[in-house]
Amino acid sequence: MLVEQLELVDFRNYQHATFDLTAGITCVIGQNGQGKTNLAEALGYLSGLSSFRQVPADALVRVGADQAIIRAHIIDDDGRTSLIEVEITRTGRGRVQVNRQRLQRTRDLLGTVRTSVFSPDDLTLVKGGPGERRRFLDDALVALATKNDALRLEVDRVLKQRNTLLRQASGRLDADASITLDVWDARLVEVGERLGHGRRVLVERLQPFVA
């Protein structure tokens, strides 16, 4: 896959900029604060629809603008050219178009553009807690198979519902709440085991490269 051209509109510090890229190694050189990392962030956003800096959508929109646009011309491994356009709003409710056709779900874009980002923050994989390593594995699973994104979202949804129930009960569960908790626990075990299995398989695939 090749990103042939990248256009940014009101993304971070870019009011409007277009970058023509070629195959091979590309080096971006500039002064501090000119937007080198922002350029990499835009490419990464096309891949996972989130920032590798772990910031909200509001931070990606240039000051004074209502929305940001990332537009890319890509060539896939079969030589086919596609135009991808991602709109980012301050509320996070943007839209995605592929070849001028709007996707019903923004997350249907996952898997179209594949990137691998390495930054100093990635040292948290070693120095940080287990949550950082789980997030890394989950991101990799989604990159390998987009169906894993739905599984990850379901785990997050069930966990959120379960924790909300416990918080509302304040440690005092009546009969109805206990039944509901059992339902959420069973669902969490089900989807959690599927996600855990995917993580274990991925770790086994990575072992020859990190051992």
Sequence positions of predicted segments:
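Nucleotide-state sensing region of NTPase/ATPase domains
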Residues: 44-132, 136-148, 208
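Generic alpha-helix structural propensity
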Residues: 23, 34, 38, 55, ...
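Glycine-centered flexibility sites
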Residues: 24, 30-35, 64, 100, ...
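Short, mixed-charge, low-aromatic patches
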Residues: 1, 14-18, 90-97, 168
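An accessory alpha-helical subdomain
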Residues: 124-210
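Basic side chains
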Residues: 12, 36, 53, 62, ...
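Pre-Walker A-like glycine/lysine-rich segment at the N-terminus of P-loop NTPase domains
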Residues: 1-45
